[in-house]
């Protein structure tokens, strides 16, 4: 997948209403952002927390995403946008292509330097640079003009799949990580749109939510902000992939039902029908048919049925593999010779 969500959580903080007893009137979004940084700092100092990050609309298995574009010479490159603080790489353990791990990625992400997935330009054949050649390039973002903002490509990560049902080369695996500044946070208008992600240390995951909630009112209510909810990323993944999993299970049930009917058909043809045709076979031999002729006749039927069976099995296996790999449309409707052969046999 290119990331690790084990022992990770996403927290959201909301602003109190004026009816709350602890509400402080007159506080601005800038002050709310400062309060949120204080909360993040307190979370990071918990002995059971390994790393804490801020992000906007880019947690794994998110139902939405931000877009981004920059230029390689004159070629526009479009991808997903990871709007994050550096610790995001440590929370989800992204991997640097040079093998140095997530710490080097966190150090590379700055307001003037972005981090890209190594495959971000692979689909752009006209691009002058690909893969490792992108490192160190300074490129214009959004507009290919001299006065446009320019960012340096400071590091490259391994490709990151969007979920288990998209291919590694899908659009969702190509992203640009851009530094999430305080000005950008303030522009969101509400802290509820900001994701606070954290990783719990090994062996500390059991009961973590209960321990955090106990401390929430005392330590993590700052200014007008309070902890709205905390969700394990494993639950986010389950909710996001439920429809795809259900669809896949339905397809497997259909394939199983089809194969079961084929199996029963084979049993009926090769066993019961043969038993009922013993008198016919004896009559044909009495009229001059040889064993070779009988074998050819029955063998032809066997080959047709076996061909149908193996074609169905091949289609089912290919369908399952391609569906989970993310290339359902191309494979199932364009590439499947076995499927075409199966329908030709039926009609």
Segment roles from a protein language model:
Residues 218-255, 276, 321-341:
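Membrane-helix entry/capping segments
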Residues 250-271:
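Selective detector of the "anchor" transmembrane alpha-helix that sits immediately C-terminal
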Residues 1, 270, 276, 339-347:
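C-terminal membrane-exit region of the final transmembrane helix in multipass inner-membrane proteins
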